Amino acid sequence: GYIKLNGRCYLGHFNLKVMSSGYIRVVNEVPLAHYLYGVVGHEMSNTFPIEALKAQAVAAKCYVLSNMTTSGDYYIGDTSAEQVYKGYNASYTNVIEAVDSTLDEILAVNGRMLCTYYAASNGGETLLPSQAWPSKRLSDGGYDIRLDPYDLGNAYSKMETVKLPVNMGGEISPALMNMLLDKASRALGYQVNQIDGIYSVSVHSPKYSGTSRCMSKCSIELAASQNGMGSERVTLEFYTSEFESYGVVYDKTLRAYWGEMDSSGYYKIYHVRFGHGVGMSQRGAQAMGSAGMSYREILKFYYPGASFASIDVSAPQDPINKNSGVEFTPSGSFVEAVTTGGVKLRSGAGTKYSSICTVPAGSTVYVYG
């Protein structure tokens, strides 16, 4: 069976601890498969292609098994800081199939399980762990820098585009015009109010060695004047992050810039990368699955230095069978009770605290002193 907590269904057992603040910490203990049911369906969506869901199931499994800690009250958190976990949804049949069919599969490098980082969208190019988190001194084994046309081609990948007409007339957004006029005035040493032409644009200076789609600087050669009189050419160079400062782009969750000339005569600067960009792009995997690629092809693309391996893990129990799940053996000093009716579990010790769930009748509750 399951218990409802904050509107979501959770399988397994709950360990509760009253914190010094008076609030209760709730820890859900479940078998690996049931944990993955609650991750895959929320890190992706049950509507994603089944092969993308299988790739997510393998990646999420390797990540949790590589990052569990035994030093605290729980093994891993349930937010996007680690992996999103939101319990069990019986209607997520694609998710359940993806988890069950790949349960014993992992990725390994030199005989050791790979910590499989992944994120929503890389913006068209992957990064290495050592580049994303230099202070952690992580190994790059299993990873590579590569262009990702699948992420880039997915219409659901987050992107903002800045357009500049080069050697032709064309529209410039008000925010970009304000930025160019301000920077041209500063460079020329007097106020200008008109852009008379843009002659070249480039986004350059890779933020990370070996990358081509994460640039830190932009150079623009243009002509500017005061009401068209005495037009002067000037080359502006500035950090790409300044597009945000001037309100040319708005999305603070995006982390990378790169650019290219298109066939219509516009230079386009792309503001991309929703997430760290290391390992699997979930939007890229979605596009690859839609194109008919298998989960193994998806994983090999994003973790090219890894090999498939297997682990010995128990088959998933039937979530509906009340006798299935994790066997729980209490320890320490406790009082055992069986609920005869629904019992409200509150966020703190006392009726003044809000109810977060109702423990069903017939549940075994252990209260520790």
Spell out what each predicted region is.
Residues 1-369:
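Conserved, single-site charged/polar hotspot
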